[in-house]
Curated annotation (Swiss-Prot):
Cross-referenced Pfam families: PALP (PF00291)
Record PROSITE patterns: CYS_SYNTHASE
NCBIfam families according to UniProt: cysK, cysKM
Superkingdom of source: Eukaryota
GO molecular-function term, one example from the UniProt record: cysteine synthase activity
PTM-bearing positions, type N6-(pyridoxal phosphate)lysine: K49
Cross-referenced InterPro entries: Cys_synth, Cys_Synth/Cystath_Beta-Synth, CysK, P-phosphate_BS, TrpB-like_PALP, TrpB-like_PALP_sf
Name of protein: Cysteine synthase
Broad EC category: transferase
GO biological process: cysteine biosynthetic process from serine
Keyword vocabulary terms for this entry: Amino-acid biosynthesis, Cysteine biosynthesis, Cytoplasm, Pyridoxal phosphate, Transferase
Organism in which the protein naturally occurs: Zea mays
């Protein structure tokens, strides 16, 4: 992990972390509180999962569980964790096999293969549970293999406790009132939230999940379009007792908010960032939150979603363009 410094990084791992925060200014009509976005889209591989790609591999190495050039790493992913692991595996010399629901974007498939990962697609109707099961099947027949288990691995929230939390606390000069984060594995909000609560017990922690798969609110798992959150089960690394509230955002609202962030704020982000922003704006409109500062995590860059429903209409428009004489 890197530290803020003008020096040249020794390798790509030193580029991870220390992402900037920026105020949301144009999608905030009716808000009485303020929102700052933590731009994890500016990680070296464009997502918050770069942090846990680094932490889970490094932790396993330090414990003697894996060895470069010998161990085969296996992991179920919705895409971004896979990419975070893939660039680390390439840099360190590991073979990596990933299982991923076929509903995830084409960009994810291409990027994973560009880093040399072996990719196995699973039934999209089975969601992440199907990807997890397939990963376990592959491990059972693969010698020298190791599943990193992002949904259960303590190294996931630990890296956010050690880096994301302190970064936010420092950037806001300790004036943060609430953290808003979409919940995939739950590692970001658990680790970051623990650190922030230790600094100020009054900091509120707000999760975000798809309304179509509102498991944390007692609902049933279901298909949705917000890639990266709403796994359909409660992950082991998520500390649900930390959460003050988990807001529900529909796929359509997440998509429209992500589009608005590009058009009004100049921020090209993914669908889960749209979901988190929609939740943050909703919170900032509540009268009791007047004058309060929310930090909302934007997990990934929008270019990873060009083939997805997020840019479907624009893609069709671009494809139908003709050359002007």
């Amino acid at each position: 992990m890197g530290e803020a410094s003008p020096s040249i990084a020794k390798d790509v791992t030193e580029l991870i972390g220390n992402t900037p925060l920026v105020y949301l200014n144009k999608v905030t009509d009716g808000c009485v509180g303020r929102s700052r976005a933590k731009l994890e889209s500016m990680e070296p591989c464009s997502s918050v999962k770069d942090r846990i790609g680094y932490s889970m591999i490094t932790d396993a190495e330090e414990k003697g569980l894996i060895t470069p050039g010998v161990s085969v790493l296996i992991e179920p992913t919705s895409g971004n964790t896979g990419i975070g692991l893939a660039f680390m595996a390439a840099a360190k010399g590991y073979k990596l096999t990933l299982t991923m629901p076929a509903s995830m974007s084409m960009e994810r498939r291409i990027i994973l293969k560009a880093f040399g990962a072996e990719l196995v697609l699973t039934d999209p109707l089975l969601g992440m549970k199907g990807a997890v099961k397939k990963a376990e099947e592959i491990q059972a027949k693969t010698p020298n293999s190791y599943i990193l288990q992002q949904f259960e691995n303590p190294a996931n929230p630990k890296i956010h406790y050690e880096t994301t939390g302190p970064e936010i606390w420092k950037a806001t000069a300790g004036k943060i009132d609430g953290l808003v984060s979409g919940i995939g594995t739950g590692g970001t909000i658990t680790g970051t939230g623990r650190y922030l609560r230790e600094q100020n017990p009054n900091v509120k922690l707000y999760g975000v999940e798809p309304v179509e798969s509102a498991v944390l609110n007692g609902g049933k798992p279901g298909p949705h379009k917000i890639q990266g959150i709403g796994a359909g089960f409660i992950p082991g690394v998520l500390d649900v007792d930390l959460l003050d509230e988990t807001l529900q955002v529909s796929s359509d609202e997440a998509i429209e908010t992500a589009k608005a962030l590009a058009l009004k704020e100049g921020l090209l982000v993914g669908i889960s960032s749209g979901a988190a922003a929609a939740a943050a704006v909703r919170l900032a409109k509540r009268p009791e939150n007047a004058g309060k500062l929310f930090v909302v995590v934007f997990p990934s860059f929008g270019e990873r979603y060009l083939s997805s429903v997020l840019f479907q209409s624009i893609k069709k428009e671009a494809e139908s363009m003709v050359v002007e004489p």
